[in-house]
Amino acid sequence: MFESTLRTLIVIIFLSAVILFTSLIRNDSNIRSQADLNTPLPEFSLRTLDLEKNITNDDLKDLFVLNVWASWCITCRVEHPFLEEISKTIPIVGLNYKDEKNNATDWLNKLGDLYIFSLYDYYGELALDLGVTGAPETFLVYKGRIIAHHVGEVDQKVWSTKFLSKINKINND
């Protein structure tokens, strides 16, 4: 009897801890995302993945999406087809995050390069300045300011709820 009650209690405590941990992660992500809104894009100077150009934050003033990705990121592969679709309507700049150049280039050659260019952030310096916790993360940037941010995969639902209304508002102004 005592052993059965003890097992039940342990299971209840474990499940409660999992639920609490999950809710804290979700809340922290939402708070962090909201805090990042309307902040300037950090100052940076990075080479493009093809090493042909040096890009600074001053070069990026129009409306664009900044997508943090890596060849080792499974979720990046999942969201890639959707990003290809939206790249037909809005420019997407890639931020290749803590990746080997050859792996990243091979990944784009295999899946298709939807980016107007990819910044090569081997050490994750710009990603750190952006508050990135991992790939993928996606930012909507307008006039040098971050106006929307999402941690994780961007799909139709996320795109519609977090990004599209802001893009439409800008296009209608």
Question: Residue spans of the language-model regions?
Answer:
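N-terminal targeting signals for export/organelle localization
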Residues: 1-47
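Short glycine/proline-enriched coil/turn segments at helix->beta-strand junctions
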Residues: 42, 60-64, 87-92, 113-116, ...
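Short clusters of small/polar residues that mark proteolytic maturation junctions
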Residues: 45, 58-59, 151
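Short acidic-hydrophobic, aromatic-tinged amphipathic segments that line or gate anion-handling sites
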Residues: 46-47, 116-121
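Nucleotide phosphate-binding site architecture
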Residues: 47, 74, 84, 147-148
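Short active-site neighborhood of thiol/selenol oxidoreductases, capturing the structured segment around
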Residues: 54-77, 83, 139
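Structural microenvironment flanking redox-active thiols in thiol-disulfide oxidoreductases
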Residues: 77-111, 122-128
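Thiol/disulfide oxidoreductase modules built on the thioredoxin-like
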Residues: 110-114, 122-170
